[in-house]
């Protein structure tokens, strides 16, 4: 069965069956966009450092993350705000201290691969 969309059906292919397999592998455009957004979050070295620290150690407070990454507290807070808005991390308040942790299972899986290579 060919999955070539009608707007591309008139174009010549060399390996038509592979083109159909490639279209199936790409899948839903919304899912591709969601993964691209995740990768964009991970593309910033400072955000990636924060996520690697959280993935390896578990929940940490902003000030502890700042010391671990060499960032200042406001920069850590801003990065965590972005990661929280994207659903990648969540904060758990304990008194006046908020400790953050990675909650996105897909991102955690990617971080596991990154950490294993280091």
Predicted features along the sequence, with ranges:
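Short, charged, intrinsically disordered terminal tails
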Residues: 97, 103, 110-118
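N-terminal leader segment of winged-helix/HTH proteins
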Residues: 1-42, 109, 114
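Short, hydrophobic-biased segments on the C-terminal half of alpha helices
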Residues: 80-81
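N-terminal helix-turn-helix DNA-binding core of bacterial DNA-binding proteins
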Residues: 25, 29, 33-72, 94, ...
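Alpha-helical residues within the helix-turn-helix
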Residues: 67, 84-85
């Amino acid at each position: 069965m060919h999955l070539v969309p009608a707007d591309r059906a008139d174009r010549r292919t060399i390996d038509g069956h592979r083109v159909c397999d490639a279209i199936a592998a790409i899948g839903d455009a919304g899912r591709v966009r969601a993964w691209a957004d995740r990768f964009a979050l991970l593309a910033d070295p400072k955000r990636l450092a924060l996520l690697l620290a959280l993935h390896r150690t578990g929940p940490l407070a902003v000030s502890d993350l700042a010391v671990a990454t060499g960032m200042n507290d406001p920069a850590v807070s801003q990065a965590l705000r972005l990661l929280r808005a994207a659903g990648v991390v969540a904060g758990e308040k304990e008194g006046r201290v908020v400790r953050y942790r990675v909650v996105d299972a897909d991102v955690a899986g990617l971080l596991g691969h990154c950490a294993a290579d280091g």
